[in-house]
C-alpha cells in the first residue's frame, strides 16, 4: 500500500504545489485567470 501512496502523492501534489506558489504571486494568478 505504501508503494501505491508513494506513486499517488506526486500525482496529486504536482498540480497543487504550483497553485499554492501562484497564490503567493496573486498578480500572476489574476492575470492568468
Curated annotation (Swiss-Prot):
Tissue: Expressed in basidiocarps.
InterPro entries, per the entry: Amanitin/phalloidin (IPR027582)
Keyword Oxidoreductase applies: no
GO molecular function, one term: toxin activity
Residues annotated as transmembrane: none
Domain of life: Eukaryota
Keywords: Toxin
Keyword Plastid applies: no
Post-translational modification (record): Processed by the macrocyclase-peptidase enzyme POPB to yield a toxic cyclic octapeptide. POPB first removes 10 residues from the N-terminus. Conformational trapping of the remaining peptide forces the enzyme to release this intermediate rather than proceed to macrocyclization. The enzyme rebinds the remaining peptide in a different conformation and catalyzes macrocyclization of the N-terminal 8 residues.
Propeptide residues per the UniProt entry: 1-10, 19-33
Cross-link position per record: Cyclopeptide (Ile-Pro): 11-18
NCBIfam families associated with the record: amanitin
Function, in words: Probable toxin that belongs to the MSDIN-like toxin family responsible for a large number of food poisoning cases and deaths.
Annotated family: Belongs to the MSDIN fungal toxin family.
Protein name, entry field: MSDIN-like toxin proprotein 2
Amino acid at each position: 500500500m505504501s508503494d501505491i501512496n508513494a506513486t499517488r502523492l506526486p500525482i496529486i501534489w504536482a498540480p497543487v504545489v504550483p497553485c499554492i506558489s501562484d497564490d503567493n504571486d496573486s498578480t500572476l494568478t489574476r492575470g492568468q485567470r
